[in-house]
A protein has these predicted regions:
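Conserved alpha/beta enzyme-core scaffold
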Residues: 1-368
């Protein structure tokens, strides 16, 4: 649907407001940006063409903490209601309920609030994905209740996105596979960061401030974050749990090594090789993974309750401990804050990783 929409935009020259869960593939963010078809974008992106259009002022961009984006959409604070929700699915039940694929994001809230729902049934996604989701949308004030999760493997919702047949106006078959990005090789700097961090965790356990299997881990996205989490494979730590936003290759490594008992997230974002490995071993991985709406996966309430260990990457940080995760040279948007603010401000232990310099040593990552 987004690719067909981009082709129409190039001919008819109109624009839309685009709300997503987080970043999307080039088939959406890239195609629509190149067609000059986006007026407003929120809450996170990683596409080069989208980023360039945002930084040049062609696209208005709202950089949000990801835990807040769904509720702000429901409240109507982002410029009105949702007209059309496009959701990828591997199946639709007879009752109209939607079985998501490898990402939950904000889909449940968008389906709930949209006037029209379009479902893309992706035939490249395995039916074994059914049952891997736990869909729970919190009530809005004044009726909001605590989100009843006290450990990563708790299930509190449904394995589908609730919907009704009358709301689904179009069903579009799709055979485009997930196009994920390659992760960088684990270099010596990343390996050393991981070793230093694991040494710190051992000291915390020895001091009695953490249990032997630690507290639930949260890991950001990207090559450095993936390298750090992969370092746990060679440690003597075991029976680990994860409560995070995005699940990458390193967590598959931990499951394969018997070190990770359970991982909760909102999306899978592995490398192409990691995605192939997931599909090949999905019957085993589904025992250890649950995907939730990002309003729950990124919930500051839950992060603080279960006491996560937050591990994220930084563009730069200052000597007072302030961290910049969003802007280059103070004014150019990179991707966005994403979920790092949700987790870092509410974790039991907060850690940011960065190499000491950027641009081949020309720019310091540590600033006054």
């Amino acid at each position: 649907v987004p690719m067909a929409l981009a082709a129409r935009m190039e001919k008819e020259h109109f624009q839309i407001n685009l709300w997503t869960g987080a970043s999307t593939g080039d088939e959406e963010d890239g195609a629509l940006a190149r067609a000059n078809g986006i007026k407003f974008r929120m809450p996170y992106q990683t596409n080069k063409d989208m980023r360039n259009a945002i930084n040049s002022g062609k696209i208005d961009y709202c950089d949000l903490h990801l835990s807040e984006s769904a509720q702000l959409a429901r409240y109507g604070f982002l410029g009105g209601k949702i007209d059309v929700a496009i959701v990828e699915a591997c199946a639709i039940t007879e009752e109209g309920n939607i079985i998501p694929t490898t990402s939950m994001g904000n889909s449940a809230s968008y389906v709930e609030t949209a006037d029209v729902v379009i479902v893309e049934v992706n035939t490249t996604q395995p039916m074994e994905l059914e049952g891997m989701h736990d869909v729970y949308v919190p009530l809005d004030p004044p009726n909001r209740l605590p989100i009843p999760i006290v450990k990563p493997n708790d299930r509190i919702g449904t394995p589908y996105i609730p919907c009704t047949p009358d709301k689904i106006k179009f069903i579009v078959p799709c055979d485009i596979p997930d196009h994920t990005r390659a992760l960088g090789e684990i270099d010596e700097n990343s390996r050393k960061m991981s070793q230093n961090f694991i040494e710190l965790l051992h000291k915390e356990v020895a001091a009695g401030r953490m249990p032997k299997n630690l507290l639930p881990l949260q890991s950001g996205v990207g090559a450095v974050a993936n390298a750090v989490i992969s370092g746990f494979v060679d440690s003597d730590l075991k029976d680990l749990t994860v409560f995070t936003e995005v699940i990458q290759d390193g967590m598959f490594d931990l499951i394969d090594a018997g070190k990770l008992s359970f991982a909760s997230g909102t999306a899978l974002s592995p490398s192409p090789e990691g995605l192939e490995r997931f599909y090949k071993n999905i019957k085993e991985y589904r025992k250890h993974i649950v995907l939730r709406p990002q309003e729950v996966a990124n919930s500051p309430e839950i992060a603080r309750r279960i006491g996560i260990i937050a591990m994220n990457t930084a563009i730069e940080c200052d000597i007072y401990g302030n961290v910049n995760s969003t802007h280059i040279m103070g004014s150019k948007m990179m991707n966005g804050i994403g979920g790092s603010g949700d987790f870092a401000r509410n974790a039991y232990l907060t850690v940011f990783f960065t190499v000491s310099t950027a641009k081949g040593g020309a720019i310091s990552s540590i600033v006054p």
